[in-house]
Amino acid sequence: MKPHCLLAHSIVLMLAGLLFVGAGTAAFGAAGPKAISPSIGAWLEDASAGEKIAIWVFFRDKGAYPQRDMEARILRAASSYDPRAVERRLRARPDRPFDKSDLPLYRPYLEALKAEGVEFRTFSKWLNAASIVADRAQTGRIADLPFVASLRRVSGRAGSPEPESLDAPTKEVGTLYLYGKSWRQLQQIQVLDLHNEGYTGTGVRVAIFDTGFWLAHETFSGLNLIAEHDFINNDSITANQPGDPAGQHDHGTMCLSLLAGQSPGKLMGAAFGAEYILAKTEDIADERPVEEDWWIAAAEWADSLGAQVISSSLCYSDWYTYADMDGQTAPITNAADRAALNGIVVVNAAGNSGAAPWRYIAAPADGDSVITLGSVDSLGVRSSFSSQGPTYDGRTKPTVMAMGQANYIADPSGASAYRRGSGTSFATPLAAGAIALLLEKHPGWLPGNVIEAITATGTRASNPDSLYGWGILQAYDASEYAPSGIASRDIRPSGLMVYPNPCLSSFSINLSATRGRGPLKIYDVSGRLLSELDLAPEGPTQVDLNAALPGVAPGIIFLEIPGSRGAKVLILR
């Protein structure tokens, strides 16, 4: 028996939420001449002696280790992930859920940068890069280091996140008691139809990246909070704190209310029953550039906590050109696509530059795996400020539209205050909440399935363009759509149950009567037979196994059950 025969028909058991898989062959920095972005090149020519900027330093590799040591390091890295994160990754990447991209940066490389006297901002294991603050001389020396692959300037935010305030929608369509003035923004994208079916986002974990969050507002009294982190000050306080600009947490508070608000008769969020991860990633201070590196750090953090959806009302264009909006150039776009590869649905605002000289979407909205949200008014007409596509390489953007004009939102000026505001920032959490409902209804769906469903059922699905994308999101219709390839993703075959999930030291296997005759066999990843266990000759059977099986090292084992699908079991002790 060859282990790979079981991989195609596997059920996953997570033991203590920890995973081991082969090291993989992820490439991080291409050999050859270093690539210095044009913006850094121009700065090096004109910078004064003491002037400093934020720079991404990309490394060529993550250090030279023997294969066995590399596998052990990946195993240790995987052990820090929430069981929900492991399960999500196994659905998205069943053959290689973890690889070298999940390893921390190589410490000797960081020590070499530290020796140059630079200030570290943050680190990205996915990009194999560190963001630093350096002057001209330091930048030149770092560019000459042999392990450095490339340098790129850290980008700033595209425009202000502050919404336009409007008194009322273009036309008041009507209200229902429960939803109050938030009725239309939810009804337009068919969220109410899913609420009526009982879907509120329960059990779905949503991460939101923004300027901060004031949870003292009444609409968050029932918030199911999993974790929060301030990436600017590196603490767990996402509300305003000493040193923050006035209004720092306002934009994030308003966006979160569209997702998680629970004020019956006033405001209800699209996914008020979901679990939330809050990341404060944007500093609104005028004197300090608001940059993409904290967004990337937040994405890696949210991934480790088991986020299934990222809602980001932030986008970045400083130091980029339209040619960079190709889905491959911006570091933040690469990170967003990596999150999607890991099974997270990334929902991002298109931007509010539709009527500006830069009229296009901004990173990471150019990502091919990113759901990009444009804005319409209450009548479904595109907002003039909504940034447009296509991407530089010709892909249709935005993906879909939602109401982003005169939205009814929580007002951070008071614990029971509400207001209206506009921007693609507000279309985004509505769509992210709707997608959380889709994932509650279809827990096996992956990002690609979600994208297929919402584009196939949007109001302009038959004629997408660079202004509306595939049209206004129709969440209920998407929930009734059958994306391709879903059946092959079922990791819970009938006739075989492994539990508890997760477990610490032992697990049980329940087999139905419909199986072949013969022993249960246990193999390691090389195909070596570790053990055989006799089964009852017929009828339903329960087999209790201890994770400390003789000869079983931490990592993956495979179970072969006669006449049934195999099982892939993950063990760490």
Report each predicted region and the residues it spans.
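Bacterial N-terminal signal peptides
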Residues: 10-23
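Hydrolase catalytic cores
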Residues: 256, 279-283, 402-468
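Autoinhibitory propeptides
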Residues: 107-186, 192-195
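Aromatic- and Gly/Pro-rich amphipathic surface segment
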Residues: 68-115
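C-terminal subdomain of the subtilisin-like protease fold in secreted/lumenal serine endopeptidases
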Residues: 183, 305, 309-311, 440-493, ...
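Catalytic-core segments of hydrolase enzymes
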Residues: 255, 295, 307-410, 455-459
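Subtilisin-like serine protease catalytic core
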Residues: 30, 48-50, 68-69, 150, ...
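C-terminal outer-membrane/trafficking sorting elements
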Residues: 489-499, 503-573
